[in-house]
Amino acid sequence: MYILKIAYDGRYSFQQQPHKQTVCDILLDALEETGFLAKKKVIYSGGRTDKGVSALGNFVVVELKKEPILSYINAKLKDKGIWVLGYREIDEIPKVKYRHYRYILPNIGYDVDAIKEGAKKMIGTHSFHNLSKRDRTKEKSPIRTIYDIKISENEFYLTVDIIGESFLWNMVRKIVGALDLVGRGKKPVEWIDKLLDENHREGVPTFPPEGLILVEAKVDIEYIYDNYSIRKFKEYWGEFFKLQVMKIGIAKTVLEFTK
């Protein structure tokens, strides 16, 4: 077995699905076309993400015939917004120590201190039944453990870093939805306590997937990295960043000159 560290830009959902292009399907096709794939199946992954959610440090475990050459694989993926950044041969599936998600929230004049106070209440082990979407295909306990939530800000956006053992469907996006209401003064900080009360039921907005990135699914693996692939990956995101800065400038100009 091999573990592959992968990144992607959110244009596809992650999990294999019939008659749909997904991160897993596209990756498996690339591994097959380059002659590395032994079995067309993802054995295990670090996290399943929805369409719109990006990833920097997700991983998949797959059966390969031989040691992969990442530059060959990434050449097949270059127009898909998917990259294999590292790999390691393994004998058993590694345990994920934690998952780190980051949400980028436009800075609209939030009460950041209130957001930080609300976030503190979510740290620890709680029932996140109000802060997740039920997956009807699986009966899962809503009890989850959040290790840390950190809030930072600049002129344009807030960064919400959430680190936990595991997450329920839409849990991070609903946590951000709750913090948004607190930060805009629509709900008091104490409202978070009600959301975490296992006997209380209340709907919470789910924020868009485009603001979310899986920073890392942490495992005790020393990946073998390919410098060329890393360089091309950084070049892509460098160009992406420049384009977004231009778009921000255009948007500000439109708002400035529109009466």
From Swiss-Prot:
The active site is at 50 (nucleophile). Its EC number is 5.4.99.12. GO terms for molecular function: pseudouridine synthase activity; RNA binding; tRNA pseudouridine(38-40) synthase activity. It is an enzyme of class 5 (isomerase). Substrate binds at residue 101. One of its GO terms (biological process) is tRNA pseudouridine synthesis. It catalyses: uridine(38/39/40) in tRNA = pseudouridine(38/39/40) in tRNA. InterPro entries: PsdUridine_synth_cat_dom_sf, PsdUridine_synth_TruA, PsdUridine_synth_TruA_a/b_dom, PsdUridine_synth_TruA_C, TruA/RsuA/RluB/E/F_N. PANTHER family: PSEUDOURIDYLATE SYNTHASE, TRNA PSEUDOURIDINE SYNTHASE-LIKE 1. This is tRNA pseudouridine synthase A. It comes from Methanocaldococcus jannaschii (strain ATCC 43067 / DSM 2661 / JAL-1 / JCM 10045 / NBRC 100440).
